[in-house]
Amino acid sequence: YVEFIYHRYEFAEYNFYGGLICAMAFEKKLSPAMPYLKKLKVHLKKLKLWAGNCPENFEPLYLLLQAELARISGSPGNTATLYEKAIQSADKYLFINIKGLANELAGRFHFQSANAIIAKTYLDNARHAYLQWGAILKVKYLEKEFGSVLGKSILEETSENTVTGSLQNADMNLVLETSNAINNAKDIDRVIEKLMQIV
């Protein structure tokens, strides 16, 4: 089916996610590993062409896949730089899902390199991006996997803030209803009756 989608955005996504899968398969040493590296480079080459023609749509994908190639090739300095570029590009072009993924992969990279403090920063940024994107289950998964690094759940904080905000809105609505009841009433008995209904 791939030959029918060459000129569609889905083909770029196919190459991006296909490249990520190849990087993971190569890292896990699924046999034989070398074809995965070769396929990753083919996917990357296609994304490079598209990123050159339309960076708004493809640059974040290309940079993130480039970072993954650098990671599995054993180039830690280049890997960290490319992750950062991918995050900045995703932020610039409003790819919140790719921003979350780039932060997550950068966090995993630093965690595996025993840089827990740096990993925490990236993983926390990933949580926020995923939450902004609406990927609640992904946030829960990250918090379960990296609970020792991330600490308190961001979902609990969000829930507490939502309850507090809801109570503040309810208080403001009560004040407005009371004010309207007093302003619109001509009879004190009706004002008292209306206030009792509001309460």
Descriptions of predicted regions:
Residues 115, 135, 184-187:
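Amphipathic alpha-helical protein-protein interaction surfaces
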Residues 147-190:
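Signal-transmission linkers at sensory-effector interfaces
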